[in-house]
Amino acid sequence: VKSTNLMAFVATKMLERQEDLDTCTEMQVEKMKTSTKARLRTESSFAPRTWEDAIKDGELLFNGTILQAESPTMTPASVEMKGKKFPIDFAPSNIAPIGQNPIYLSPCIPNFDGNVWEATMYHHRGATLTKTMNCNCFQRTIWCHPNPSRMRLSYAFVLYCRNTKKICGYLIARQVAGIETGIRKCFRCIKSGFVMATDEISLTILQSIKSGAQLDPYWGNETPDIDKTEAYMLSLREAGP
């Protein structure tokens, strides 16, 4: 039921941004919407709800509303995998950010050298999380980039750090048949706005991200309060290490 609601929400929001989708992607999303409606009818015997109810519940599960936003400004980047550097094309704002979570007030140290992001990769259930910054401030802003062909990926969620205005990670589903399969694989890793993992290394690093977010005193705000943020950072500096 939860998976169906999530798919209903994403399909609806993606189709609201048709001008940002190519014809092939739009057809795949329409197909996803049709199959999700079929699942909803099948589930109606034990979980009766309307299509609109499914969308609303999916929005809550996804930890916020998809909003309009500008793409972060950055130079073309590449990521090194197995000794080779692959270029990455970040789409402008195919799908706007997920959630309205405020910033996480911790220092962000980009692991950035020129146009090369030295990335740490974590594998989980057919998807790969690549962490590109030495910080725990995963703002739940995710850029949806269908079919980045040069890396031969079918789907990518790009995580964006509001503290440094830079990409801090991205989650990809590799070697999948279509956009719906890619989204489903990523959903296995994303629950209510948080990335989940089962292997020990991924679990440790991602639990620290989640716990850090829960400790953020401004987590409940819809938008960051700049004055409070500056005051909080000043108090941390005055307190010392």
From Swiss-Prot:
UniProt key word Transferase: no
Primary location recorded for the protein, binned into one broad class: host cell
InterPro entries from the UniProt entry: Flu_C_NS1 (IPR005187), Flu_C_NS2 (IPR005188)
Keywords for the protein's UniProt record, in alphabetical order: Host cytoplasm, Host nucleus
GO cellular component: host cell cytoplasm; host cell nucleus
Localization per Swiss-Prot or TrEMBL: Host cytoplasm; Host nucleus
Function (record text): Suppresses the RNA silencing-based antiviral response in Drosophila cells.
Official protein name in the record: Non-structural protein 1
Chain's gene name: NS
